[in-house]
Amino acid sequence: MTFKPELATHTLEAEGLRCPEPVMMVRKTIRNMQDGDVLLVKADDPSTTRDIPSFCRFMDHQLVGQATETLPYQYLIRKGLEA
């Protein structure tokens, strides 16, 4: 999975927040986006490496990229399953 932050149409800074806050903020932000929009999430909570991919599967969004080797962790989430 290649990480391309330039795909993002929205950004969410979730650094300093701890579980469950990052995923709650992702859900709230995505709710206000259009299908096909891409959210860049920046977080430093280790639980996001598990929680954000699970959120995408459960809520039918696409995790189109992630960079979790260094802090902050970064995720690209496309709203909906259709590109």
Curated annotation (Swiss-Prot):
UniProt keyword list: Cytoplasm
Locations listed in the record: Cytoplasm
BP GO annotations: tRNA wobble position uridine thiolation
Pfam families: TusA
Keyword Cytoplasm (UniProt): yes
Record-level Gene Ontology MF annotations: sulfur carrier activity
Protein name: Sulfur carrier protein TusA
Lineage, uppermost ranks: Bacteria, Pseudomonadati, Pseudomonadota, Gammaproteobacteria, Vibrionales
Gene behind this protein: tusA
